[in-house]
Regions:
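Soluble N-terminal domains of membrane-associated systems
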Residues: 1-97
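Hydrophobic alpha-helical transmembrane segments and immediately flanking/interface helices
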Residues: 96-103, 210-236
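Alpha-helical transmembrane segments
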Residues: 142-158
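Alpha-helical transmembrane segments of helical membrane proteins, especially in multi-pass transport
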Residues: 157-165, 181-212
Length: 259
């Protein structure tokens, strides 16, 4: 029996306790961030529970070599770091040659960074903010507005970390297939467009509540947002979210003037 087959469970899944420790450590992946290794130390810290399964355990040579290898420079989006943690842990437990792991590790960081930035910072975060802003515009109390934002945003990245760790370990060196998942490939465009549509209603409603002094035509605002949705469904990928948002806001301003 090879060392790889002795180390990796037959089901290609981690024991529940190890998986849970790795998942919880993902929330501290940026805890040792620095300009020299960026997320490197955090990646090694998150992988460490799985590396204990290597032959010799924590006192073995493969454990110390793997830990040192992954504590070096690495950069990715922190919410998608679980993909790298799972895939690299699987590669180590499978006994993949160190040189191949290094090449794989180098190639993995860039895609995880760019996809994460577009999905989270440019799409999911604005969407959650605008949903909370819309709730404020409809009269929700400030504490409820804060709760709506925190719950919606945190549910998203809690799920993303868990998904990344699971799919990374399942796929191993073939994790590139997972990066073609519709959530990662089309998610930024869909979420970004939804954020643009919600902005057309949330911003005027919230502004009116803050400024006051005039009647709010909530039905008309919602109608314009629905018109934007129809336009997006009609033109699909040819219509960018930010252009649609500007068009809706322009229609709203024009309607307010002629009203």
């Amino acid at each position: 029996m090879t060392t790889a087959s002795a180390a990796v469970p037959a089901s290609t899944s981690l024991p529940t306790g190890i998986w849970l420790r790795m998942y919880l450590r993902l929330f501290a992946v940026q805890g040792s961030w620095n300009y020299e290794s960026l997320l490197g130390n955090g990646i090694a810290f998150c992988m460490e529970p799985a590396l204990r399964l290597l032959p010799g355990g924590m006192t073995g040579q493969r454990y110390s070599e793997a830990l040192g290898r992954h504590a070096r420079y690495f950069n990715a989006h922190p919410y998608l770091a679980g993909v790298a943690v799972g895939a690299l842990a699987r590669a180590e437990l499978d006994g993949v040659p160190p040189a191949m792991i290094e090449r794989f590790r180098t190639a993995l960081g860039g895609p995880l960074g760019s996809v994460g930035d577009r999905l989270v910072w440019a799409s999911w975060l604005p969407l959650c903010s605008l949903i909370a802003l819309g709730a404020f515009g409809f009269g929700a109390r400030p504490i409820l507005v804060i709760a709506i934002f925190l719950v919606s945003y945190n549910l998203g990245h809690f799920w993303l970390r868990a998904w990344g760790l699971r799919v990374g370990f399942q796929k191993g060196l073939r994790v590139a297939d997972a990066l073609g998942n519709p959530v990662l490939r089309k998610g930024p465009q869909v979420v970004g467009t939804a954020a643009a549509l919600i902005a057309g209603a949330a911003i005027p409603l919230a502004s009116s509540r803050l400024i006051g002094g005039g009647r709010v035509f909530a039905a008309e605002i919602i109608l314009l947002a629905m018109v934007g949705g129809v336009l997006f469904a009609r033109f699909g990928g040819r219509l960018e979210g930010w252009r649609l948002s500007l068009a809706i806001l322009a229609l709203l301003v024009l309607f307010s003037v002629i009203r």
